[in-house]
Curated annotation (Swiss-Prot):
Belongs to the universal ribosomal protein uL11 family. GO terms for molecular function: large ribosomal subunit rRNA binding; structural constituent of ribosome. InterPro entries: Ribosomal_uL11, Ribosomal_uL11_bac-typ, Ribosomal_uL11_C, Ribosomal_uL11_C_sf, Ribosomal_uL11_CS, Ribosomal_uL11_N, Ribosomal_uL11_N_sf. Part of the ribosomal stalk of the 50S ribosomal subunit. Interacts with L10 and the large rRNA to form the base of the stalk. L10 forms an elongated spine to which L12 dimers bind in a sequential fashion forming a multimeric L10(L12)X complex. This is Large ribosomal subunit protein uL11. NCBIfam families: L11_bact. One of its GO terms (biological process) is translation. PANTHER family: 60S RIBOSOMAL PROTEIN L12, LARGE RIBOSOMAL SUBUNIT PROTEIN UL11M. One of its GO terms (cellular component) is cytosolic large ribosomal subunit. HAMAP family: Ribosomal_uL11. Keywords: Methylation, Ribonucleoprotein, Ribosomal protein, RNA-binding, rRNA-binding.
């Protein structure tokens, strides 16, 4: 018989740096989940990723207080800032440009984000990422 789902918890946790402090501890603690078990499993799963890269994770909590989790790809904005070498996007994206990205960089980000994007082909996914880049004040070379 399948386990009954008690709820879902959505968090962004830095890769390899999950620990019981906020926001992880309180979010899992109020559902009765073993916090250290999650931290150990998450850190083991993110071992191959760049340390500190925020990873969105959806934790499914069951009635018997067990859990499973699904990791998503890092947010596009973080990948774009890393590729452009900037700390933050433009506060006035239409007027002030803060960086420039080539099509090759956009394709690399689109292939990284492929599982989470809905585009039919690579070109559609690149256009999606390019739109995010423009809204951050980055110049895009397509």
């Amino acid at each position: 018989m399948a386990k009954k789902i008690d709820g879902y918890i959505k968090l962004q946790v830095p890769a390899g740096k999950a620990n019981p402090s906020p926001p992880i501890g309180p979010a899992l603690g109020q559902r009765g989940v073993n916090i250290m078990a999650f931290c150990k499993e998450f850190n083991a799963a993110t071992q191959k990723l760049e340390v500190g890269l925020p990873i969105p994770v959806v934790i499914t909590v069951y009635n018997d207080k067990s859990f499973t989790f699904i990791m998503k790809t890092p947010p596009a904005s973080i990948l774009l800032k890393k590729a452009a070498g900037i700390q933050k996007g433009s506060s006035v994206p239409n007027k002030t440009k803060v960086g420039k990205l080539t099509r090759a960089q956009l394709e690399e980000i689109a292939t990284t984000k492929e599982p989470d994007l809905t585009g039919a082909d690579l070109d559609a996914r690149v256009r999606t990422i390019a739109g995010s880049a423009r809204s951050m004040g980055l110049e895009v070379e397509l």
